[in-house]
Amino acid sequence: YCIDMFDKWKKSYGKNIRTYLEIVGEIEALISLASITYVRDDYTFAKVNECNDLKPEIDFKNLKHPLIKIGDAVGNGITLKGQTCVITGSNMSGKTTFLRSIGINLVLSYAGGPALASEFKTSVMKVLTSIRVEDNVNKGISTFYAELLRIKDMTEYNKNKMPMICLIDEI
């Protein structure tokens, strides 16, 4: 009986199953983006501008990582206009968390989601990262070599003369 019912359903609706699954996937993605606004109240929506002169801009105030509890997260700010910035500090001072906060909030904003910041302005740019790179024993790639390959990809992308931000942690 169940097999017959499934066959009838498949004949009637089976050709549309891909469309149905894509719609469900899109709804789930939108719910995921919206859920941040339900659980957190320290967010804003980004002001995103086109980058016309290859000098991308970022201006964040009180930027936080969305996966760190509200009471534990430390907000930081940064303003860059087409510059290079090297972030230094002692071990366990939050450098990696800050880089991750920048990257994840940029990606969330570009997807139309909220950013965990009191103010968030950015240009449209490609987000490239070399954070927590791992080796690949099967391919004979050490961690150091994997990092070099990521940075090589970044320099190759730079040849396109397109706006980008490179977030590199510990070479």
Annotate the PLM regions:
Residues 4-7, 39-43, 120-121:
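Short coil/turn segments at secondary-structure boundaries
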Residues 17-48, 59-61:
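Amphipathic alpha-helical domain-onset/packing element
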